[in-house]
A protein has these predicted regions:
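Basic, alpha-helical nucleic-acid-binding regions used in initiation and control of genome expression
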Residues: 1-257
C-alpha cells in the first residue's frame, strides 16, 4: 500500500523538507543531491517512504516512464508523486520553510544531528577525490566512516578533509616504494594513518589541520541548503566542529569572533 503523503510543507517536518529541497535544488541547479552516493540513496529512500516520490527500486531503471526524471549527477531515476504541489514551485517554498524553522531545543537537536552526518559525508567525499587523484580505489573512502565510529571524536568538515589528504598521501608514499602493487597493504596503511591523525587533530595538538575548500559553497544541494537556509553558518559549515553553541550563535557574532 502506497504511503499517504503529508498534506502541506509544514507537515513534512524538518528532515523531510530538507531532503525534498535537496532533490529539487539538485535538479534545478545541476548539483549532486548529497555529498556521497550512499547518502543520496538514503535521502531518496526517505522521500519514497513519505510518499513524495516514486523510484524504480529494486530495479535500477524504468524501461518506459514518460514522467520519470533523473538526478543530473547521480543518474538516479525518480517520479514526483506529491499531488499537493507543483514541482516547479517547491524549491523556493522549501527554502522559505527551512529559514523559518524555529530554534527551539528539538529543532536545534535535529540541526546538530544533520550537521554531524554531513560533516562525515563531506570528509568521505573529499577522501574519494583524493584516492581517485592517486589512482586508488575510491570505495576505500568508506573507511573514514569506520574511523569516525571507532574513535567517537568530533572533527570539523575541514579537519576531516585534512585527515583524508594526509592519509592518502601516506598511502601514495608506500605505493611508490613497492616493487609489486599491493593494494590491500596500501589500503591498510591509509586506514592506519587516518586513525592516527584523528586524535591529535581533535585535541588541537597539531596546527594547520584544517583544509577549507576553495569555494566555500558546498557542491551538494543538501549541504548548501543546510549551511545557507536551515542555518546561518555559511562558510563556517566547514570550519566549526558541530555543536549546539555554534548553531545558536548569531552569524554576526561568529564572524566577529
Amino acid at each position: 500500500m502506497a504511503p499517504t503523503p503529508p498534506a502541506t510543507i509544514d507537515d513534512l517536518g524538518l528532515p523531510g523538507a530538507l531532503y525534498l529541497g535537496a532533490l529539487m535544488e539538485s535538479c534545478g541547479r545541476r548539483t549532486r543531491i548529497a555529498p556521497t552516493r550512499r547518502m543520496t540513496l538514503a535521502v531518496m529512500g526517505q522521500l519514497r517512504e513519505l510518499g513524495l516520490i516514486d523510484v524504480p527500486w529494486p530495479e535500477p531503471r524504468w524501461e518506459a516512464s514518460p514522467e520519470a526524471c533523473e538526478t543530473p549527477i547521480e543518474g538516479l531515476q525518480w517520479r514526483f508523486a506529491w499531488q499537493a504541489y507543483e514541482p516547479d514551485a517547491l524549491a523556493p517554498a522549501l527554502r522559505d520553510y527551512l529559514q523559518s524553522v524555529p530554534r527551539d531545543d528539538f529543532a536545534v537537536a535535529l540541526r546538530l544531528k544533520i550537521w554531524r552526518e554531513l560533516v562525515v559525508a563531506e570528509g568521505e567525499r573529499y577522501f574519494e577525490a583524493q584516492l581517485s587523484k592517486h589512482q586508488f580505489d575510491p570505495s576505500w573512502a568508506q573507511d573514514l566512516v569506520f574511523v569516525h565510529r571507532e574513535c567517537g571524536l568530533e572533527l570539523s568538515a575541514a579537519q576531516w578533509r585534512y585527515c583524508a589528504w594526509a592519509a592518502t598521501r601516506q598511502g601514495a608514499s608506500i605505493a611508490q616504494q613497492q616493487r609489486l602493487p599491493d593494494p590491500a597493504r596500501v589500503r591498510e596503511v591509509i586506514f592506519a594513518e587516518l586513525r592516527r591523525r584523528v586524535g591529535p587533530v581533535a585535541s588541537g595538538q597539531w596546527t594547520n589541520t584544517s583544509f577549507m575548500p576553495f569555494n566555500a559553497r558546498p557542491d551538494s544541494a543538501l549541504s548548501a541548503l543546510f549551511a545557507e537556509h536551515l542555518t546561518t553558518l555559511g562558510e563556517l559549515f566547514w570550519a566549526l566542529v558541530p555543536s549546539e553553541l555554534a548553531l545558536l550563535a548569531p552569524a554576526r557574532a561568529r564572524h566577529v569572533s
